């Protein structure tokens, strides 16, 4: 999944505005801001710390023991021309002064890395078997539509922390990526084109028992398990009208999707009891369950007219209690709580010196 939803993309998406019927309802007293990287009214954040400085860093996910982060980065200073996978210990390592350990091959493009049970291996997707070069980005379209590429060469692999690929989990033709692991350590959820559409699937951590979870037309992706492993939260852009369906299918035939409208959906891990969680309009994406399992944190630009900023929000799993968490004027996204519930990590454009750099930030979480 191409994740560079920043600045130009935000402007393009801002042309499609909608009304928000899920109003924020939570009220807090205003404390004095003492954290230098925390903005006013960010009540849930404490001791915000920048973990990287420079490049495009995102999708940082915690190890099971809440001590390590694995993430993807494009940063010329680190020798990467397109996303590669790195890991480090944010409690001890300084990723600003020293490049973290790269555990992908350095070939092709990678995405969506996640620790496996035991924290000695990582699952991620890569295009390197199809082509060792970085795959080309889509050219600007005559119709002006912003699109994401769905690279057919993406397959899912397991690597150790030295960068040795131990196993290839998917071998079907077409896109297989966006893998995340259940907190119970038994299942992986991922997005695949094997049915002819972008649907969610689960499999055992050894790649066996692949089971289709969703089956409605549209791009279902970015899925995560609930803390007890019983539910999935994901984002989807599901076309409704004949024209929307026609455009979706035409783009998909070109290996492209247009993520201008995305809402959050929740279901049981087997796909049952599927329901739409948000009806906010615009782009609502990268959801992750709160440690309680009763709320979801996600990124959204639904309150904007021009498509940005993106900020983080909380919502109850019954669709009530929408609350804004961050108050950035640019871009906050890719949130993940540590398994022990102490920390939140996210990607942001805050304090990037006016560049387009996206850096990782870590904060203590305050309920």
Residue ranges of each PLM-predicted region?
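C-terminal motif of bacterial Sec signal peptides marking the signal peptidase cleavage site
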Residues: 12-14
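Bacterial signal peptide processing site
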Residues: 16-18
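Multi-bladed beta-propeller domains
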Residues: 33-56, 88-109, 159-175, 204-219, ...
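Beta-strand-rich domains and repeat architectures in extracellular enzymes and scaffolds
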Residues: 35-38, 47-81
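A flexible loop/linker signature enriched in serine peptidases of the S9 family
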Residues: 53-56, 73-85, 104-110, 125-155, ...
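Residue-level detector of Asp-centered blade-edge/turn motifs that repeat once per structural unit
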Residues: 64-65, 117-118, 183-184, 227-228, ...
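Hydrophobic beta-strand positions that form the internal "hydrophobic ladder"
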Residues: 69-70, 122, 188, 232, ...
